Structure formats: C-alpha cells, structure tokens
C-alpha cells in the first residue's frame, strides 16, 4: 500500500507516454476513517502496532474524541477509530489509472489481445502470470478465487460535506465517501458466484440507509439517485491475496484474490512479481505470506475487514 501511494503520486512522470503525455489518476486525498465497536477494539489496537512498525501513518482516535474532529459523526457505539489523513490516503479514478498503465505497457512493447474465442490451441510461453481475477478458479481449479457480488449506491444529501474521508463503520459493515456533489455508499451484503449484476436494491432501505442515518444524522435526508453491482475477486479461504509461483508448474505465477483491494495493491504486486520472476526471489517486500502453497494446504491467513 505504501509503495502504491508513492507510485500513484508519481504517475505524471512514471506513466507518461507519447500518446498520453499527461497521465493522471485524479487523486482525491481525503483520507480514510475506519470505526470499530468494543468487540473489535483490542484486535484493532494490535493491528495498529503493525501499522507503526511499517510507518503507515495510521492514527488512533478514541471513540469519545471523534465528534471533536468530525463534528458530523454520531459516535454512539464506537470504541475506537483509525485515521490516515489527507496527506497519506484517499481515492482515485480506477479507469484513468488503468488507462495510464495500459498506455505505458503498450509503449514498452506489451500486446493486448481482445476478442471472442473461436478455437483452442497451444500457446508456448516462457512465463505465464494468471491475473484472471474473478475467473481464476475457471482456469486453475485448485485456487478458490471466485466472483463475489457487491452493491454500491449513489445518494444525494442536502448537506454536502466534501472534505469527508472515505469512512467505514465496522459495526454495520457499511462504508461511504463523497463522489462529486453526491456520495457513494456500499452494502455489507455480498453474494458468491452470482450470475447477474443486478443491484441488491432492497439492501438500501433495509441496511444501508438506516446505518448511514444513524452514524451521520445529516444523512436522514438523503435520496437514492442510482447504484450498480460489481464483482470482487474473492479468495474464499481467507479473503487474502494469492501471489507467487504456482508449485505445480514450472512457469506459472499467480496474482489474484484481492477482494476489492486490487487497485491499491497493484503497483506493489507488479513490482514483487517482476522481482520474483527475474531474480528468483522477492527483493523489496517479502510476499511469501500470500504464497500459493498456503491456499493449496488450506493454511488460512484471514483478512477480517472487507468493505
């Protein structure tokens, strides 16, 4: 994540091409705020120690202190919160980021092939990287990465708070952030292997709106203006990534199962796999904790918080 932040802030220089001389990811540096109830407080305090060791810049805020910093928040039921401010975190436009990466890769010689499969034949390759996301299990049946459908709602509120960070309420699983003059809000519900991408509209009235209005009183007046559903590539074993060499093959590597965090982890994963493939080992960050072997042996490393 730290490397991704550095990479994204350097996009204008790193991803500049002849065809795209001014690449951008439209960074909105509003920060991240995650709130926890008493049942998860101790677990989060332990996680913060790891954040400190990694110099992640994460700050702890007592639940009682939240209204002093974010006066629009109702802190009822919140024991503690973690916050990374606008100098460190925020969100970007994923389409623009993807386009900039693709443009640079093309300039460096990568070839992208898109089309309908008419027939099947062998293709010989020195190195293969499976980055098939939600469809990983269709290619490699021993890797339990499958589509997990999530719904996001777009809402409008008379009171707009443009400086609001991306906020996750772990007491309900609902998250939200500003999007232009509106807000995006995510449902805590998900469906594995869903064949359709019809939004779960009932979730808004039953789950999302009550949670938003309880936590941000101004949201009692919000109106639903739209929504959509999309897939996370979810590793059903532990909600964590599967990265590294596949032990059953001489030349197959994995980069999958990011459970909605692929964009923020992509730069670091790309660098790590480049090192592993070209030198035989990780050089910058050791990602053995995400090794394929752990999945094949069902050695879970659970990621407890997925928004």
Regions found by a protein language model. Name each.
Residues 1-69, 173-174, 212-213:
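Dinucleotide-binding Rossmann-like beta1-alpha1 core, especially the glycine-rich loop
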Residues 1-8, 41-48, 63, 97-98, ...:
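A general structural signal for well-ordered alpha-helical segments in protein cores
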Residues 2, 34-43, 84-103, 199-204:
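Short beta-strand to alpha-helix junction loop
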Residues 10-14, 104, 108, 272, ...:
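Active-site catalytic microenvironments for nucleophilic, acid-base chemistry
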Residues 16-29, 127, 132-251:
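Active-site substrate-recognition segment that forms the wall
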Residues 62-63, 114-116, 226:
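Short loop/edge segments at beta-strand edges and connector loops
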Residues 84-127, 131:
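Helical element adjacent to the flavin cofactor pocket in flavoenzyme catalytic cores
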Residues 216-307:
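C-terminal catalytic lobe of FAD-dependent flavoproteins
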């Amino acid at each position: 994540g730290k490397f991704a932040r550095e990479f994204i802030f350097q996009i204008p220089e790193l991803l500049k091409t002849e065809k795209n001389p001014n690449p951008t990811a439209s960074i909105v540096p509003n920060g991240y705020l995650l709130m926890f109830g008493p049942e998860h407080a101790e677990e989060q305090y332990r996680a913060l120690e790891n954040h400190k060791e990694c110099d992640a810049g994460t700050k702890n805020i007592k639940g009682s202190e939240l209204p002093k910093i974010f006066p629009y928040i109702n802190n009822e039921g919140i024991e503690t919160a973690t916050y990374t401010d606008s100098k460190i975190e925020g969100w970007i436009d994923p389409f623009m980021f993807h386009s900039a990466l693709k443009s640079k890769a093309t300039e460096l010689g990568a070839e992208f092939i898109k089309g309908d499969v008419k027939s099947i034949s062998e293709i010989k390759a020195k190195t293969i990287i499976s980055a098939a996301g939600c469809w990983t299990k269709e290619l490699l049946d021993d890797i339990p990465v499958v589509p997990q459908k999530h719904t996001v709602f777009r809402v409008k509120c008379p009171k707009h708070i443009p400086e609001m960070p991306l906020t996750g309420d772990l007491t309900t699983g609902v998250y939200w952030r500003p999007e232009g003059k509106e807000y995006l809000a995510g449902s805590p519900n998900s469906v594995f292997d869903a064949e359709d991408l019809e939004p779960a509209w009932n979730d808004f009235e039953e789950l999302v709106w009550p949670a938003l209005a309880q936590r941000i009183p101004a949201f009692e007046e919000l109106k639903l203006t739209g929504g959509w559903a999309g897939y996370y590539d979810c590793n059903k074993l532990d909600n964590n990534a599967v990265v590294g060499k596949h032990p059953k093959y001489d030349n197959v590597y994995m980069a999958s199962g990011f459970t909605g965090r692929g964009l923020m982890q992509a730069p670091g994963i790309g660098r790590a796999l480049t090192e592993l493939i070209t030198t035989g080992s990780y050089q910058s960050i050791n990602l053995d904790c995400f090794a394929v072997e752990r999945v094949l042996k069902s050695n879970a490393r659970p990621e407890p918080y997925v928004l």
